[in-house]
């Protein structure tokens, strides 16, 4: 995999729209640092798809340009598996809706970027 080149970045920005990406150093640092702060990752680009179609199109774009990615969900885990090591970060934070609650079967359908507290609140309601 390679670092994102200008053609990839232009296509990704067009795909995601102005709210769907960032190259701001503060935001990049935030997604590259696990919340425990045990160590520091790095990323050149933050992508925030708004839905599954954008996420799928972004993955295809990454594959076509040989750009590695690190997905991040709600970032409520303790294993730091979402820490990037030079890859772009694909943050699912814009995808956080509770899709359904099935009390009879004790199940929830929640989008990938929902933090654990969202699932807990939906289950309690």
Q: Where are these predicted regions, by residue range?
A:
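Short beta->alpha junction loops/turns
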Residues: 51, 112-113
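N-terminal flexible segment immediately upstream of the FAD-binding catalytic core
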Residues: 1-64, 77-106, 121
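Hydrophobic, small-residue-rich alpha-helical packing segments that form membrane-like cores
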Residues: 103, 114-125
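Glycine-rich beta-strand-to-loop/alpha-helix junction loops that act as flexible
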Residues: 72-76
